[in-house]
Design a protein with these regions (language model features):
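Short, surface-exposed coil-to-beta transition loops
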Residues: 1-5, 18-19, 84-86
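Extracellular/luminal recognition modules and glycoprotein regions
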Residues: 3, 28-37, 48
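Short beta-strand scaffold segments in enzyme catalytic cores
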Residues: 4-9, 90
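Short acidic-glycine loop/turn motifs at beta-strand connectors
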Residues: 10-17, 92-96
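Short, solvent-exposed aromatic-acidic interface loops
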Residues: 18-32
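Low-complexity intrinsically disordered segments
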Residues: 39-134
Length: 134
């Protein structure tokens, strides 16, 4: 039981099974994933230039947000629970969702995008040294 998802970064000239990926046991709904990706982009985290770095920083953002010591996994696409019976896989390019796999249900729409961004930032701005520009 969970609200599982995998976020994978689409990589050029690399087989999909080897794409850098992040497993979420909780908070895998699109209404949380899109704000997480937005915050990564806001912080200037490089996505396509170095996908392993991108996944590491995204996992830091997620970990700071959900807290605790469980519920995250990092690996390649083939290593993670992609057909997880919850939210499936979000295929990401430049921090935008460009494809979706193994999602068969209704889209979760419980959280407001801007409120979620604010909540994620409240746990990460200081860590990432981010200040809003006027």
């Amino acid at each position: 039981m969970g609200n599982r998802a995998v976020i994978t970064i689409k990589e050029k000239n690399i087989p999909q099974e080897d794409w850098q990926s992040l497993y979420l046991h909780w908070n895998g709904g699109r209404d949380t994933v899109e704000p997480l990706l937005h915050v990564a982009k806001l912080y200037g985290v490089r996505c396509q230039d170095d996908p392993s770095y991108a996944i590491a920083r995204l996992s830091q953002i997620v970990g700071n947000f959900i807290q605790g010591t469980t519920s995250l996994g990092v690996g390649t696409y083939k290593q993670l629970d992609t057909d997880n019976a919850d939210n499936g896989v979000y295929v990401v390019k430049d921090w935008e969702i460009v494809d979706r796999e193994y999602h068969h249900g209704l889209e979760q729409q419980e959280y407001d995008f801007n409120e979620m961004v604010s909540e994620i930032r409240s746990k990460n701005d200081q860590v990432f040294g981010y200040e809003e520009q006027d």
